[in-house]
Swiss-Prot record:
Cleavable signal peptide: none
SUPFAM superfamilies: Cell division protein MinE topological specificity domain
Homology family: Belongs to the MinE family.
Domain of life: Bacteria
Database matches in InterPro entries: MinE, MinE_sf
Alphabetical keyword list: Cell cycle, Cell division
Example GO biological process: cell division
Primary role: Prevents the cell division inhibition by proteins MinC and MinD at internal division sites while permitting inhibition at polar sites. This ensures cell division at the proper site by restricting the formation of a division septum at the midpoint of the long axis of the cell.
Pfam families: MinE
Name listed for the protein in its UniProt record: Cell division topological specificity factor
HAMAP family the UniProt entry points to: MinE
NCBIfam families: minE (TIGR01215), PRK00296.1 (NF001422)
Length: 84
């Protein structure tokens, strides 16, 4: 009985899955398009400076630039390793 239910269930069509994935990619690229040209270089240089003092991975640093009307905020988050 379970086998029949499994075979009869409605599956997502590959087109709808592809559409969802494409929407995620487009939204991500639109978010990056609004950032200044210097952001990738700034992120790289900040990571190099932090690595002089603490060993961190590339994905341990997150930089975001938020803009509200006439104010811009540069936010830097670094996940530091635990001392052992």
């Amino acid at each position: 009985m379970k086998l029949l239910e499994f075979l009869k269930r409605e599956r997502k069509k590959s087109a709808s899955v592809a559409k969802e994935r494409l929407q995620i990619i487009v939204a991500h690229q639109r978010g990056q398009r609004d950032q200044p040209d210097y952001m990738p270089m700034l992120e790289k240089e900040l990571l190099e400076v932090i690595r002089r003092y603490v060993q961190v991975d590339q994905d341990a640093i997150n930089i975001s630039l938020d803009r509200d009307n006439d104010c811009s905020v540069l936010e830097l988050n670094v996940t530091l390793p635990r001392d052992e």
